[in-house]
Amino acid sequence: HHRLVQAAADLKGMESGLVKVASFSSVSAQWLPLILKSFGELYPNIEFEMLTGDYYDQIESWIVSGEADCGFLRLPSLKGLSVYPLHQDQLKIIVPCGHPQADCNPFPVETIATEPFIRLEEGDDYEIRAALDEMGVHPHVRYTAREDRTILAMVSNGLGISLLPELMVHNSPYPIVICQPPRSFYRQIAIAVKDKKALSNSTRLFVDHVRRWVAENGNK
């Protein structure tokens, strides 16, 4: 029995190939290093090429065209891909340290409406706009930025407040306070492939590993 188990493990270790993974910056920073490390311990001969998209639709296009074998994106997917939902990423309000309402739980709606607001660039802010609409808030948008790290730095420097998915604000390199909105809103993150029936073995192994890893670690 042991020899059979060992033979299977040897075969597993021999698995090789190249997987092209498309992602967006918060997943690339928060999840991918840990996912790739744990996957590499199981399959040391599978290589990766990372593509970071500025917009979700760019990631979808890469998967459709075959430039990427799989990709992280938010639901709903518009291009008829095979998707595996992974994680409900809760939206959070971020404010500078020392903000007078930093300790409020939940954060007051009227403050969101009156303070200078730093908005994530359109195209990636669908859930944020929907959440503001549902709260009946029309924020005073003073700045619009494309990069989540830029927004974190601006909030940290007291230029305004923002509403961003938790994965973007988790482990912020800049000091900020993360606050709970008056209601819960989410961005749904998934991993997608063009056709789950036509995956290379190495891509299938990686997608399965991602699903397991996020189920175990996604909420930490």
Which residues are covered by each model-predicted region?
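Beta-alpha-beta core module
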Residues: Y43, K79-P85, D89-Q90, C104, ...
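Central regulatory/effector-binding core of bacterial HTH transcription factors
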Residues: S16-L78, A145
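Hydrophobic hinge/microswitch elements
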Residues: D54-I59, V64-E67, G123-V177
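A late-sequence structural motif
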Residues: W31, V177-K220
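Secondary-structure junction motif
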Residues: Q101, E115-G136, L199-V207, N217-G218
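Flexible hinge/capping segments at coil-to-helix
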Residues: K12-G13, G80-F117, E121, N201
